C-alpha cells in the first residue's frame, strides 16, 4: 500500500524524467493540483517548515492505484469487457470508441473490440500543463487512429478525478463534428451521472468522507 511519502517520491522521479505536472497527475491518478503539491513537497527548502505553517493549504484527493490490472493483459481484458458491458444499453448505432491517453487508450482497445467499433485516441491538454491556465493549452486526436467524421462516439478513461479531462474530450468531439453518446471509466472520484448531457458509467464510485462532509453529499452513496 502506498502512502503520501511514496507518492511524493514517485512524483519526484517522474518530474526528473521530464514529465509535466499534468502527465504526473495522469500517471498517479490524482488531480493536477495534487500532482503540483506532490512535486513541490519533493523539493524541500531550508524554510519548508515555516512555509508550511504560513500556508496551511493541503491537497485533498484520493489516489487510485490500479496497476495490478494494468500490468496484466488478462486482467485488463476482463476490466475492459466489464466496461463494455456497461455501454451495451446504449444500442448498436455507435461505431467509434475514443480512448483518452494514456491509460484510457489500452482500455478503449478492449472496449472497441467487444463492441465492434473503430478506435480513436485523444491526448488531453493536461499532458502539456505545468503551471498557469490550462485553458491556454489544447488537446488533439491522433491521426494514427480513426477520425471523428460526424460519428457517434463512446469515451473511455481509467479515472475521473475532477471531470475536467472528460469534459474537455466531450467538447473536442463535438467541435470535430462528432456526437459523444456515453462515457465509461474504471473509477469515478466525483460520483457524476453525466457531464455536459452525456451519461457517465463507472465500475467503481469513490466518495471521500471527511468530518465536515455535508450529509447530502453522501446521501446517494
UniProtKB/Swiss-Prot annotation:
HAMAP family associated with the record: GfcR
Domain of life according to the entry: Archaea
Coiled coil: none
UniProt-recorded name of the protein: Transcriptional regulator GfcR
Polar residues: compositionally biased ranges: 42-57
One example of a Gene Ontology biological process annotation: regulation of gene expression
InterPro entries: GcfR_halob (IPR053401), GfcR-like (IPR022854), PRibTrfase_dom (IPR000836), PRTase-like (IPR029057)
Domain notes: Contains an N-terminal DNA-binding winged helix-turn-helix domain and a C-terminal regulatory domain (or effector binding domain) resembling phosphoribosyltransferase (PRT) domain.
Keyword set, alphabetical order: DNA-binding, Transcription, Transcription regulation
Start and end residues of each stretch annotated as Disordered: 35-59
Function: DNA-binding transcriptional regulator that functions as a regulator of central sugar catabolic pathways.
GO molecular function: DNA binding; orotate phosphoribosyltransferase activity
Recorded family membership: Belongs to the purine/pyrimidine phosphoribosyltransferase family. GfcR subfamily.
